[in-house]
A protein has these predicted regions:
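Bacterial Sec-dependent N-terminal signal peptides
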Residues: 1-30
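A structural "domain/chain start" motif
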Residues: 25-138, 153-261, 265-345
Length: 345
């Protein structure tokens, strides 16, 4: 068996990123929009006759630990972890607030004015009450760790997946699109490969195989879609989506497809460290979210004999560059969202 953890080559990749960062983003085509969003997300087109839009809750989910696993039957599996360091909560709130301003400007450029008439409506107050216990710190052992920040420190609201409820009544009563956004931002792109080799047997060495296990990565900001493991109610708080309800019980749910993502070309990493297994620095790292990260690795991750290759990458971010890269990816997301609204309303 051959296990390979590919090191991150900072100089080469940063050069590529800088070359790409000057390329201007283009409006997504109709085909690209269809590839990005799940089908049948609109009913009675809430945006079609309205010149006003309300945003009840704009939420950004920032991942700072990412886990990815690939398995090949009868060969083995690869588990790769990425850790993000150097980004503070104050910066994440700052990004969320700035994103709200950019989204509002994008909607206004599309012919919509922003309304805050929802704030005193009984259905909005009901939504706030129903969502007051939503966790802002997420720990999923097969996915990673994240924190959720709401723009302008507004209440964190999630619309139900069903059609009926306070969210529907709110849009219907106000007769305008009233929505909430949830956007997941990852910091790493992981690649994994498993190649089945040949089996052999010798008297001296016994049985052996030439299977090969590889993992690699690049530090890149990604707005990512719903993960493949989420269905039904689990779709809430996972992936990227914008849900609006409007007059005549209409709705517009722009939900990114499984595994779809938008990336930024702006580099943000100051340094990357690669290791097989869990690095010593991580054993001492205390997370504000879940305490000792060692406990997470004990849930089916590192040094328990379950993976043929177990690797970690620790990324130290430049805070300002991280902010620029995230906002760049979010600007691209806004282009997709507005294109979806135009084509489906």
């Amino acid at each position: 068996m051959k296990a390979i953890v590919k090191p991150f080559i900072a100089t080469a990749l940063m050069g590529v990123f800088f070359l790409n960062s000057d390329v201007q983003a283009q409006e997504p085509s109709e085909k690209e929009v269809k590839q990005a969003f799940a089908p049948k997300g609109t009913h009675r087109a809430p945006f079609s006759k309205s010149k006003e839009v309300a945003l009840t809750s704009v939420n950004l989910q920032f991942k700072f630990t990412t886990r990815q696993e690939q398995e090949k039957r009868k060969v083995g599996n690869v588990i790769t972890w990425g850790f993000l360091e150097g980004v503070e909560d104050a910066l994440l709130q700052e990004i969320a607030d700035e994103y709200y301003k950019r989204l509002a400007a994008k909607l206004q450029a599309g012919g919509f004015s922003l309304s805050e008439s929802y704030k005193d409506h009984k259905s909005y107050l009901k939504l706030v009450e129903n969502n007051n216990d939503l966790p802002r710190e997420i720990n999923k052992k097969n996915w990673g760790i994240s924190k959720i920040f709401t723009a302008n420190k507004a209440p964190y609201i999630e619309y139900p997946t069903g059609m009926l409820g306070a969210h529907s009544a709110l849009g219907n009563d106000l007769k305008m699109p009233v929505g909430q956004l949830f956007i997941t931002i990852d910091f790493i792109e992981i690649t994994q490969n498993i190649s089945k080799g040949l089996s052999s047997y010798t008297l001296m060495d016994g049985s052996s195989r030439t299977d090969q296990f590889e993992t690699d990565m690049r530090p890149v900001i990604r707005v990512e879609g719903v993960t493949a493991g989420s269905i039904g109610r689990a779709l809430k708080g996972d992936g990227t989506y914008a849900k609006f309800t409007g007059g005549n019980w209409s709705y517009c749910n722009a939900i990114f497809r499984n595994d779809f993502s938008i990336t930024s070309d702006i580099p943000y990493a100051n340094n990357v460290e690669a290791a097989k297994g869990m690095p010593e620095s991580m054993k001492k790292f205390k997370s504000d979210v879940v305490g000792d990260l060692v406990s997470i690795f004990s849930k089916g991750a590192v040094k328990n004999g379950r993976a043929n290759l177990e690797a970690t990458y620790t990324i130290l971010a430049n805070p300002q560059a991280y902010k620029n890269a995230v906002l760049d990816a979010l600007d691209k997301y806004n282009d997709y969202l507005m294109a979806y609204i135009r084509e489906n309303n």
